Amino acid sequence: MMDKKCTLCFLFLLLLNMALIAAESEEGANQTDLGVTRNKIMTAQYECYQKIMQDPIQQGEGLYCNRTWDGWLCWNDVAAGTESMQYCPDYFQDFDPSEKVTKICDQDGNWFRHPDSNRTWTNYTLCNNSTHEKVKTALNLFYLTIIGHGLSIASLIISLIIFFYFKSLSCQRITLHKNLFFSFVCNSIVTIIHLTAVANNQALVATNPVSCKVSQFIHLYLMGCNYFWMLCEGIYLHTLIVVAVFAEKQHLMWYYFLGWGFPLLPACIHAIARSLYYNDNCWISSDTHLLYIIHGPICAALLVNLFFLLNIVRVLITKLKVTHQAESNLYMKAVRATLILVPLLGIEFVLFPWRPEGKVAEEVYDYVMHILMHYQGLLVSTIFCFFNGEVQAILRRNWNQYKIQFGNGFSHSDALRSASYTVSTISDVQGYSHDCPTEHLNGKSIQDIENVALKPEKMYDLVM
């Protein structure tokens, strides 16, 4: 019941945010990109003229070129025979701000004039020299991101349908899976909205509406939820195996608080700090250390989770080596999936600060980071659902029943149903042990359950 209420609440918030962003986008569409660029240039021109008037007059000996405004950038006094240099402006989308602009002061103390026009000239050619390649790479990364989140949403929704439809899958660990999957679905939806409606809408970013900041706040909050629900998975397994030694039930209320409630704290602190100390338009810039308010707790959650999982493996290998050997093997299967996911979901925070230098290295880095960041939902659903032995057994059983019911040319249908029941029962027992071992054993050993499961098969042999 709580899952359904949380789902409806989050979907309502997402739809409301989408409507606000769409309304702001239509309202700001009248202000064209050209108008935004013109405002930037006029602001830079005003600041340049103020600087020209306020800076002290050049007192040094020798010839020099006077300070000037060339129409796009402001230039200081430069000694004759030198070349002045600064970064390209960000007025235009096809300009690369990491490239350089040059302006030459000749030996006579005059700014260089272009021979074709006989007018003072600044070399902006490098600003869009490699624009075509960079735009192509940016588009590839954009489509890679959208496809990744689209596949993640599709796979996660299919997984949630499977978990909700098959009641035999209901257990506490599957409940944690459902919440983890739902957090990834919400995060992917918000990311797609942010990339399509905010990040690529220069007019909307220029107007700086509240809705785009709300979108960024929700995005950062849901990103935190992803990692803290992964922490919940690790804590659950650690409590089940190490602390309570295969306890039957745990109170999930604390997991809901940690997974959905705690990420609100860093998200709110970041929003307050951002509005006070780095209140850029739509909070879209990543060039601020305030993002450590979000990334710090996430890294801490990953480290704690990794510690829990390694401790679980230690216990399963040592303490349960002699006793509960069969159970320890089954628990190891459940731990293995989480142990694989934690490094994969956390590697982006290890690689993020170490951006390599060089054109090819940077491009490879961008592709790897985008795959690691935007295909997480697909990875989570694949490991926790599609590779889950219990899910595979349930789907296999229903597929076999479907073939028996609707297939043609089968004889002895009653016997085949009995055989299908026998196979599915064995598969279900083995599959249940993968994710919910203690909740399905009910105090019996593995051998006892296998003996019960084999009884229909023996009866089938007698009938045949």
From Swiss-Prot:
It is a multi-pass membrane protein. Disulfide bonds join 48-74, 65-105, 88-127. Residues 288-289 are annotated as: Required for RAMP3 interaction. The chain crosses the membrane at residues 140-164, 176-198, 210-238, 253-273, 290-314, 330-351, 367-387. The modification Phosphoserine is found at residues 420, 445. Residues 1-23 form the signal peptide. The keyword Oxidoreductase does not apply. The record marks 202, 373 as: Required for ADM interaction. Glycans are attached at residues 30, 66, 118, 123, 128-129. Residues 24-139, 199-209, 274-289, 352-366 are extracellular. It holds the Pfam family 7tm_2. Residues 165-175, 239-252, 315-329, 388-464 are cytoplasmic. This is Calcitonin gene-related peptide type 1 receptor. G protein-coupled receptor which specificity is determined by its interaction with receptor-activity-modifying proteins (RAMPs). Together with RAMP1, form the receptor complex for calcitonin-gene-related peptides CALCA/CGRP1 and CALCB/CGRP2. Together with RAMP2 or RAMP3, function as receptor complexes for adrenomedullin (ADM and ADM2). Ligand binding causes a conformation change that triggers signaling via guanine nucleotide-binding proteins (G proteins) and modulates the activity of downstream effectors. Activates cAMP-dependent pathway. It comes from Rattus norvegicus (Rat). Keywords: Cell membrane, Disulfide bond, G-protein coupled receptor, Glycoprotein, Membrane, Phosphoprotein, Receptor, Signal, Transducer, Transmembrane, Transmembrane helix. Heterodimer of CALCRL and RAMP1; the receptor complex functions as CGRP receptor. Heterodimer of CALCRL and RAMP2 or CALCRL and RAMP3; the complexes function as adrenomedullin receptor.
